[in-house]
């Protein structure tokens, strides 16, 4: 019964849970380190994507073409802001080049997929999968650097309440996306249903952790130098 209830309010979890950390971030915008601002913008883009998806779906306007275009634009633009957030802490001098490489590959993949499949058939699936793999790599890289920093107190750093849930969330979503895009749904319908249930629950608690992390943010703190 609990599982059925959670499935029945799927749209509530996915559409509204992300608004919690975003609104907290907007409220505390001037009080938190500017290094976290790209992450707040990333959450805002997620809110916009979920709101548009929900509005289009309820009005019968979410056609495959519209849905795939929305997925592509979100994967690309949200990825750019998430990369900027990561590299503000990674202290890399090449992050603009990496953002450019990310953009070029996303659009190149889209162009190839569109050329091969056409407007009616392309799904932006390769872009979604590529962006997740790309982001997972740099999220993991920053986590490893933070862990190896001798003076970092993990349990007191709000940054870890963003990076760790985000890493597991992206890995989970990557697996789910690959199964959805590249397998026969009829053969693994039960598995996909269970994964979706897990996605709903984890998605909600991830955004709660993001909210806690934002509340812990303090101004002008260099998390790599303390």
Predicted regions and their residues:
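Terminal, non-globular segments
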Residues: 2-226
